[in-house]
């Protein structure tokens, strides 16, 4: 749907495996062997769909990754000006779309990178004295209309960028049961 580039196809597949593993790591149906392998890892890579042309379906594609039953666990609202709130969303959402990724300020990139690799969350809820350990279930994806969005001299290994050459097919229905069953089996 997005690109035939082998680097994208392989990288996006691995990211989807990480996304589904993160969702299942604390699920009661997950066997202990799989849980042990995934519990200390975070899906620390984020695909970025990039095109200077608007209307290619970047944001729509991101929304389509979530089946209707899980739409409440998808957000495009992610504010890095409040680190505690940003961290709490890692336990509250399954997929966070960094829509218009290029609008994030360079000063917020270290915080974003730290949050992307965080696997253990200790969050203090309002009116509580101590923090609670919560599972990290969120994965990140992003979109941008600018091709020059990654300017970090230390590298950008956390982002899998694809430059769109055509509109994304967002009209063909996603077979969610088949998609997520296959990811779970892998």
Predicted regions: what is each one?
Residues 1-91:
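P-loop NTPase catalytic core of nucleic-acid-dependent motor ATPases
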Residues 28, 37, 42-45, 72-77, ...:
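Feature primarily recognizes SF3-like P-loop helicase cores of small DNA viruses
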